[in-house]
Amino acid sequence: MRASMFLALAGLVLLFVVCYASESEEKEFPRELLFKFFAVDDFKGEERACKGVFDACTPGKNECCPNRVCSDKHKWCKWKL
C-alpha cells in the first residue's frame, strides 16, 4: 500500500514537471517567432536586380525577373504564360 502511494505521488510530480516544461516552451514560441520574423524583415530592404511577381514595373523596360513580364494593363510583373 505504501509503495503504490509513493508511485502515484511520484507519477503526479513527474506529470507536473512535464506540463510545466511544455507550458514554458509554448510561452517562448511567440517571442521566437517574432524575432525570426523581424530578422528576415531586415533583408527586405536590399534592392534586387530584377522585380518579382506583383512588383510595380514600367511596361517595355524589361525590369521583371526571368519568366516574368510586365503587364500593360496592371503595371506589375506577372508570370509569363
Swiss-Prot record:
Changing residue 49 to Y: No decrease in bioactivity. Keywords: Calcium channel impairing toxin, Disulfide bond, Ion channel impairing toxin, Knottin, Neurotoxin, Postsynaptic neurotoxin, Presynaptic neurotoxin, Secreted, Signal, Toxin, Voltage-gated calcium channel impairing toxin, Voltage-gated sodium channel impairing toxin. The keyword Secreted applies. The keyword Zinc-finger does not apply. Its main location: secreted. Residues 22-48 form a propeptide. Disulfide bonds join 50-65, 57-70, 64-77. Lethal toxin with multiple biological activities. Inhibits voltage-gated TTX-sensitive sodium channels in DRG neurons (IC(50)=55 nM) and also shows activity when directly tested on Nav1.7/SCN9A (IC(50)=25.1-630 nM). Inhibits N-type calcium channels (Cav2.2/CACNA1B (IC(50)=100 nM)). Also blocks neuromuscular transmission. In vivo, intrathecal injected toxin shows analgesic activity in the rat formalin-induced pain model, without induction of motor dysfunction in rats. Belongs to the neurotoxin 10 (Hwtx-1) family. 23 (HwTx-I) subfamily. This is Mu/omega-theraphotoxin-Hs1a.
